[in-house]
Amino acid sequence: MARYSSVLPPLDLSISMGEGWTPLFLFRSGGPYYKLEYLFPTGSFKDRGSVLVMTEAKNQGQESVVQDSSGNAGASIAAYAARCGIRATVIVPRDTTEAKRRQIELYGATLEIVDGDRAAAASMALSLSGSTYYASHVWNPLFLEGTKTVAFEIWEQLGFRAPDAVVVPA
């Protein structure tokens, strides 16, 4: 993502784990292309946003962050928080997969499991945000600044032309 630093908020390269520039794979002649975002350091495109969110947390001198997630964003923030030496608490709903829970904990984050859905996890994170930095992948605009770089990459990888369409799984 450093190649796009001129159009991004500050990016601390010491926090970066080489995110960005994932392959654009042509499935067969004439398309479609697939952007292989699972090749990020934590296995998720959410690393694009996490690196900028955690750069800001580090620049502010934050000692801890909180994130609510159903898995991928929590793992990503946990990894980048560890990279920064910042404590992370990740709040997940009870139905979060065991694999995601383990990944979050392997990065050193404190895992809090709440009864209820994503909204319950978000509510708990918001309740803690007065005493810690809320590293939200939903509300923090820096997260979106990072995720937009996928558009720059696709445009560049297609020879500086826009695709006819983009399909994003929900």
Task: Give the role of each language-model region.
Residues 1-170:
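PLP-dependent amino-acid enzyme catalytic core
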